[in-house]
Amino acid sequence: MRTLWIVAVWLMGVEGHLYQFENMIYQKTGKFAIIAYSNYGCYCGWGGKGKPQDATDRCCFVHDCCYGRVNGCDPKMGTYSYSFQNGDIVCGGDDPCLRAVCECDRVAANCFAENLKTYNKKYWLSSIIDCKEESEKC
């Protein structure tokens, strides 16, 4: 189901902040998120359950938790303000909700970059059915 959703979004043309998040990830890792992170482990992609499989999957778990704490807007819609300054992502703008979404995305993109060396292709295209352990709390 999560793969179908990701493909549907990709085919529609990614709008708003999902495109921005993709760009952040590419700038920090050199990887295209839709390919590398849309169906990785138990948490990267649509939904999530179980125990994160590795450090990269934990980045997605933390990102999901961060989105869960955002109030006042839909974390997957809208457009936020950000820039790259000296290799760092800097979130801006006046809307506190969109700024919070940007911060969630910034932290995740940095986390992916910090864990590039441990990215394991065996978790790419893994099935969420394999994520049977009890989910952690945020």
From Swiss-Prot:
Q: Which InterPro entries match?
A: PLipase_A2, PLipase_A2_Asp_AS, PLipase_A2_dom, PLipase_A2_dom_sf, PLipase_A2_His_AS
| Any one Gene Ontology BP term | lipid catabolic process
Q: Where is it located?
A: Secreted
Pull one GO CC term from this UniProt entry.
Answer: extracellular region
Enzyme Commission number: 3.1.1.4
Its chief place of residence is secreted
Class of enzymatic activity (EC top level): hydrolase
Q: Which residues form a coiled coil?
A: none
Q: Which Gene3D superfamilies match?
A: Phospholipase A2 domain (1.20.90.10)
Please give the positions of the paired cysteines in each disulfide bond: 42-131, 44-60, 59-111, 65-138, 66-104, 73-97, 91-102
Q: Does the keyword Glycosyltransferase apply?
A: no
**Which keywords describe this protein according to UniProt?**
Calcium, Disulfide bond, Hydrolase, Lipid degradation, Lipid metabolism, Metal-binding, Secreted, Signal
Q: Where is the signal peptide?
A: 1-16
Kindly state what the record says about how the cofactor is bound: Binds 1 Ca(2+) ion.
In its UniProt record, a GO molecular function of this protein is: phospholipid binding
Instruction: Tell me which domain of life the UniProt entry assigns to the organism this sequence originates from.
Output: Eukaryota
Q: Which cofactor does it need?
A: Ca(2+)
Cited Pfam families: Phospholip_A2_1
Report if keyword Transferase is assigned: no
Q: Enumerate the residues binding Ca(2+).
A: 43, 45, 47, 64
Reactions catalysed, as given in the entry = a 1,2-diacyl-sn-glycero-3-phosphocholine + H2O = a 1-acyl-sn-glycero-3-phosphocholine + a fatty acid + H(+)
Please report the name of this protein according to its UniProt entry. Phospholipase A2 EC3
The organism encoding this protein is Echis coloratus
